[in-house]
A protein has these predicted regions:
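Extracytoplasmic small-molecule ligand-binding "clamshell" domains
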Residues: 1-57
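Bilobed "Venus flytrap"/periplasmic-binding protein-like clamshell domains
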Residues: 1-19, 31, 77-144, 219
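Short helices/loops that flank or line small-molecule/ion binding pockets
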Residues: 35-49, 62-63, 95, 140-160
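Pocket-lining segment of extracytoplasmic ligand-binding domains
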Residues: 100-199
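Stable alpha-helical elements in mature extracytoplasmic
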Residues: 10, 14, 33, 37, ...
Length: 252
């Protein structure tokens, strides 16, 4: 699965598919930060969104998220965080990055912020104590580009997005090297606002979970590197909750 910021046209096709099948007008809205999208959902100003697994696991009650479906990619409804460095760099493990420049994606990102902070906490460090400088790229492809061009020494990114570019446009991923991968987490879910009608929630859920049986749906899914959508399981997001709890307990 790839994020809307990187693939506007493919997600536009997905929304048009839902709109046509359900006779319900949908428009694609993008914002710079995850927090902005989450707040729009909380206020009921948008109906549905693909959101990061981090905010879903930790703050779904606050924002009123209700997960309808999760993408299955390469046969699994999971994704990982990849710690990447430039392929010509001498860095082979997290500890080698002490005193270097690191790029997070978004402050609320699971793979692009929470995971590397958790890794550092395990060695009794924080981003400020460990890195010389940190920056926020606000998208995974920006982080990949920054590492490839040596604008930063390392970054933590969504493994699905790295794999998408490595397969379809490896210009920059081939300049990077993955030195660490996280455990699997539940993939970013499709969620709806608490204000959406129950009937529409059911209709959207049914449609998106069966689109892999429709030729047009298959074409759209293939472009997004999604096999199909399945119902979410809360246990897939428990490891994320545990990371939040660990960071809160340790003060890291």
């Amino acid at each position: 699965m790839i994020s809307p910021k990187e693939t506007f046209i493919y997600y536009q096709e997905l929304l048009e598919y839902i709109s046509k099948k359900l006779d319900y007008d949908l428009q694609l809205i993008q914002r710079k930060t995850y927090g902005e999208i989450n707040e729009l959902l909380r206020k009921g100003e948008i109906d549905l969104a693909f959101i990061c697994s981090g905010p879903y696991a930790a703050r779904k009650e606050l924002y009123g998220f209700e997960a309808l479906a999760v993408p299955v990619i390469r046969g699994k409804p999971f994704y990982q965080s990849y710690l990447i460095v430039n392929k010509k760099s001498p860095y082979n493990k997290l500890e080698d990055l002490r005193g270097r420049v690191f790029a997070f994606t978004d402050p609320e990102s699971n793979t692009g912020a929470l995971v590397p902070k958790y890794w550092l906490a395990l060695i009794k460090e924080t981003p400020d104590s460990f890195f010389h400088e940190i920056t926020y790229s606000y998208s995974h492809n920006n982080s990949i580009l920054a590492v490839a061009k040596n604008l930063v020494d390392a970054a933590s990114v969504d493994g699905h997005i790295w794999e998408f570019y490595n397969r379809n446009n490896p210009t920059y991923t081939e300049e990077t090297h993955v030195i660490k991968k996280s455990i699997p987490f539940g993939s970013p879910p499709l969620v709806v606002s608490r204000y959406l009608s129950e009937k529409l929630k059911v209709n959207i859920s049914t449609l998106i979970q069966t689109m892999h049986t429709d030729p047009q749906g298959i074409r759209i899914l293939n472009k997004l590197m999604i096999d199909r959508f399945v119902p979410p399981e809360e246990e897939w997001y428990q490891p994320i909750k545990k990371m939040y709890q660990y960071l809160s307990f340790t003060g890291k």
